[in-house]
């Protein structure tokens, strides 16, 4: 996160250099990063909750390419259609799900002209289905010629989506590996600096006493979408569920 904040212009490095297209560059602000075509989607979104998607993107644009909200709304719709996003341009950020907010951030970066897109822990707060949809979008961006950096600790996601893996530990560079030539065990060992086992002995709780049962729970969210649908589970004594 610290590293991408330097690439994105939020922090300035004490030493070292950044090169963009083989030229040394000074990135002293997010505007500098924007001008270079570097877009960052932070783990904590940089959106104004009381505004809708159109308004958030409008205030992020530094030029006059889009003269009014209708132009921006059309551009949002075009980008969403191209990459398979689902987004309501007129929905307020405060009424959006986490996935929808992330979509707005990505679309904002694309509209601002990002050639390099950096995503900080993009699946940390997404469901597996939302993560799968995001990865489909990322693959389309790759085909479109965009370069993408994903910061994540989820090893299976690293293997599923990346071409190469850059490993850091305690703020230091450790190694760069081709994804096709590594596996979860090697990545885990390099990340923590020692041999680890990913196999865990599981205890059977089939015969344990049931201490909590939930049956067929359903409810609607505040926006009247499905919050829970027919959820059931049992919790056994001594079990971590």
Q: What positions do the PLM features span?
A:
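Glycine-rich phosphate-binding loops of nucleotide-dependent enzymes
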Residues: 1-241
């Amino acid at each position: 996160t610290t590293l991408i904040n330097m690439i994105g212009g939020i922090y300035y490095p004490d030493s070292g250099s950044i090169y963009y297209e083989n030229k040394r560059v000074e990135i002293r602000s997010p505007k500098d990063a924007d001008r270079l075509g570097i877009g960052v989607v932070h783990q904590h979104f940089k959106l104004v909750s009381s505004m809708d998607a159109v308004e958030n993107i409008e205030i992020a644009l530094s030029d006059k390419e889009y003269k009014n909200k209708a132009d921006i709304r059309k551009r949002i719709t075009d980008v969403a259609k191209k990459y398979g996003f689902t987004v309501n341009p007129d929905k307020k950020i405060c009424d959006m799900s986490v996935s929808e907010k992330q979509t707005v951030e990505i679309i904002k970066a694309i509209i601002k002209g990002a050639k390099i897109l950096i995503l900080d822990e993009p699946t940390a707060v997404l469901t597996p289905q939302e993560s799968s949809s995001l990865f489909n979008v990322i693959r389309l961006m790759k085909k479109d010629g965009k370069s993408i950096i994903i910061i994540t600790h989820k090893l299976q996601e690293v293997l599923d989506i990346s071409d190469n893996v850059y490993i850091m530990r305690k703020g230091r560079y450790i190694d760069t590996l081709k994804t096709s030539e590594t596996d979860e065990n090697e990545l885990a060992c390099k990340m923590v600096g020692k041999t680890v086992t990913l196999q865990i002995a599981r205890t059977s709780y089939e015969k344990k006493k049931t201490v909590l049962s939930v049956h067929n729970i359903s409810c609607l969210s505040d926006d009247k979408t499905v919050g829970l649908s027919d959820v059931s589970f049992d919790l056994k004594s001594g079990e971590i569920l």
